[in-house]
């Protein structure tokens, strides 16, 4: 049988949370699996332990993958999980594959599933189709520049260059569509003395018209991990999905690999 693609392997791995299939999980993972979700131990054994724990729970875990992308040795996924009935969560997962095709490292960001936002969009609906595979690097570069100029505030006067007028489809749970919607939300936060700061960009992954950025900063005074997925259309930023997560206090970490 044909070797599974990296994306198929990543999807097979997350599905073991629902099936309890430890053999499949074991076959997909590198022994030295590096976990950056700070609530879990690191290594393949810790992952298998989670699968076994979920399999034994009274309420079955559900895994509903929405989008899947591949970039070099990494796969990035947008998925709705409900772990043992604890409540639906929207997640971005990133898996790195080693030279043997095993899953060797994992990063993620999770947030509770919310009601539709002021423009009626959910955290996961919207455009699905991956296109413009010939523009992957161009789109990655555009988002890197956007992060530097706009999200990090280095050249805010360039903001209009990145958008087609006010057209911007927004899936953030608290913000309305349009560049105007984003500005209004940031203005309202500023009035409360809250700023959204992007200090470091750790990863910018891309496939065609979709680009995922992993950034570290603060929301108010809280250390925060930002996962932002942008869809690029004709060289402009057209649509945005995100998950923001507070970075847990180091005293609670179950591994010492760090969030990033």
Where are these regions (language model features)?
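C-terminal and inter-domain tail/linker signature
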Residues: 1-260
